[in-house]
Amino acid sequence: MIRVLHLAPEAYPLAKVGGLADVVGALPKALRPLGVEAHVLLPWHGGLEARRVGEVAFAFFGREERAPLGERVEGGVRFLLLGVEGFGRERVYGYPDDAERYLRFALAAKEVARGYDLVHAHDWTAALLALYAPTVYTIHNLAHQGLVDPGLFFSWTGLPWSLFHMEALEFYGRVNLMKGGIVFARRVTTVRPSYAEEIQTPEFGMGLDGVLRRHAGKLRGILNGLDTEVFDPGKDPYLPAPYTREDPSGKARAKEVFRERTGLRPPVLAYVGRLDYQKGLDLVLKALPRLLEMGFRLYVQGVGDGGLQEAFLRAEEENPEGVRFLPAYDEAMARLAYAGAEAVLVPSRFEPCGLVQMIASRYGTPPVARAVGGLKDTVEDGRAGVLFETYHPEGLLYGVLRLFRLGAEEMGLRAMEKDFSWEGPARAYREVYREALG
């Protein structure tokens, strides 16, 4: 039995901003039948309830600090929560002191990691663990790298300045935490095989392509799965009625309730996820007047960029019958949108993997997605959804019109046939763990 500690900023069902939470919440369950005992360690975010099971002592800025350790079991997965300073807040990310908060969390986490064979660290917030423990490091999104002033970094962590050079942590005069994860982890994974190749090129490497090429021997690409027990319209507790591909009658009831909750008459286009320019939301805003003219309605749900949030609030005020915006993480409404909208929009600038298109397909709602990254790999264009190439409002409009011309409802039913389970990816991760420990 391999004992693995997953380290991440978010994990479903405790804290969720985007698809990272779904991955971290689901993978441990899929690993259990394969002989891997995996627990998840998160910051003790504001509002999370857990049973206190101990206290962790660690050093930060040359002083000893102590953090309460909580425990909570959900869906058979053991979640541990670290109550370090700075995390009793509403949001997971988006504060000026995020670098300090997550470094403090990582320094406390390394003490918890002593009881495990291996750490599986996710994205920049957990990358520091690669310097302290045997680590598999997963890059979910290369755009967010965790850049820190070197004076602050070495004062906070107590690590030696000898690590501040091009072959270690230095990146254009700053400390790059993601680079540290890549350099010091025993194995590095990304969220699909072709992404592992793409990020070694200047076009997609976000400045780290040279580092990734130098460490290509330990780089693996594993396509993300989907927790098909959690995302199952046949037994989803958030839906007013169950439905399956064989008997989709309950989907009509979901559409009715979605219309009642939002006040939007069909056809409704839905976006669920982070408010981030990476996600192509500027395209949605620019295309919105034309979409409304054509008779479409728009439902947007998510948190993130303040400018985008203001823009969608204004859009709702100016178009009360055509736009509904929910600036919150609300899993019940997200599931209802996946089931009740006529289409789900995924117009990303770039997308390492993406889970929204998988969830929408599982719920029989076809995605309109840009033909990039993981979207291109997982959306069957013209059969179970629609892809568009050009990053322009006209491209998005073309995709939406093409979907409805080809038959959105029929495509949704075909999308439900696709297998996005974690079974295959979990076996691949077990092999990576064995390599890292070998």
UniProtKB/Swiss-Prot annotation:
Domain of life from the UniProt record: Bacteria
Reaction(s) the record says it catalyses: [(1->4)-alpha-D-glucosyl](n) + ADP-alpha-D-glucose = [(1->4)-alpha-D-glucosyl](n+1) + ADP + H(+)
Q: Which InterPro entries match?
A: Glyco_trans_1, GS/SS, Starch_synth_cat_dom
Q: Which Gene3D superfamilies does this one have? A: Glycogen Phosphorylase B
Pfam families linked: Glyco_transf_5 (PF08323), Glycos_transf_1 (PF00534)
**Enzyme Commission identifier(s):** 2.4.1.21
Residues that hold ADP-alpha-D-glucose according to the record: 16
Q: GO terms for molecular function, please? A: alpha-1,4-glucan glucosyltransferase (ADP-glucose donor) activity; alpha-1,4-glucan glucosyltransferase (UDP-glucose donor) activity
GO terms of biological process kind: glycogen biosynthetic process
Q: In which pathway does it act?
A: Glycan biosynthesis; glycogen biosynthesis
Which SUPFAM superfamilies does this UniProt record tie to the protein?
Answer: UDP-Glycosyltransferase/glycogen phosphorylase (SSF53756)
Q: Which UniProt keywords apply?
A: Glycogen biosynthesis, Glycosyltransferase, Transferase
Q: Which PANTHER family does the annotation name?
A: ALPHA AMYLASE DOMAIN-CONTAINING PROTEIN (PTHR45825:SF11), GRANULE-BOUND STARCH SYNTHASE 1, CHLOROPLASTIC/AMYLOPLASTIC (PTHR45825)
Spell out the family assignment given in the record's similarity comment: Belongs to the glycosyltransferase 1 family. Bacterial/plant glycogen synthase subfamily.
Role, per record:
Synthesizes alpha-1,4-glucan chains using ADP-glucose.
Q: What is this protein called?
A: Glycogen synthase
Organism of origin is Thermus caldophilus
